Amino acid sequence: FKEEMRDCDPPELPNRLAEVVKRPKSDRNEGDLPDPEQELIVATSGGKDSAAMALWLRFESGLPNPMHFVFNDTGHEHELTYQFLDVLADNLGHTIERSEAKYDFLSLAKHKGRFPSAMARFCTTELKVLPMQRWMGAQDLQDPVLCQGVRAGESKRRSQMTVWDDTLGDFGGFYDIWRPILRWSVEEVFAIHKRHNLEPNDLYKMGAGRVGCWPCIHVRKGELRNAFRRDPGLL
């Protein structure tokens, strides 16, 4: 392994690797909507929840805000996810733009000398958060709102999140974070897919519990075994 690393150029890493800096919680109420002039950055992962959020924002929210649908490519995605994003873009009638990490998952793990853990999910920061912030910083955005398709029912950590939050971006400015489907049930997620004639990512039919960055090393062991049985090349 050390010989391999000597032969490889180190990945280009940003200087600031810490989690994004927090400022006081947003003073918005849970039911508040973005101001009409704010631009919505709709984070789209290829999963059912972010797709449900995108459908709701595009067709059912009634919001007049400019919307940018953005997929952050971690370099560790299943081909079915790319195919689903093409179908989703057609359904939305809207281009899904892409932000990309500067290095892939394995390069990051080699640089760190370890894999991420439940207590140190640096993969999320380095492969999702910072690339999205860099994408936002490269655009001429007017008071952006980052829309995240997460639900409280997914995990204990997410159950402690708030609908509105704000954070300091790596590009130097604060921006709002909005989680409009935080209180939705999984039944509501699948219902909006059905209303808009959109089949969820086919990975769910193969037993995947989560599909972004696939296979995620944080999924259940049984799900990993199932993924490796279906695709031995993953090993």
Regions found by a protein language model. Name each.
Residues F1-L235:
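Nucleotide-activated chemistry modules centered on ATP-dependent adenylation/adenylyltransferase
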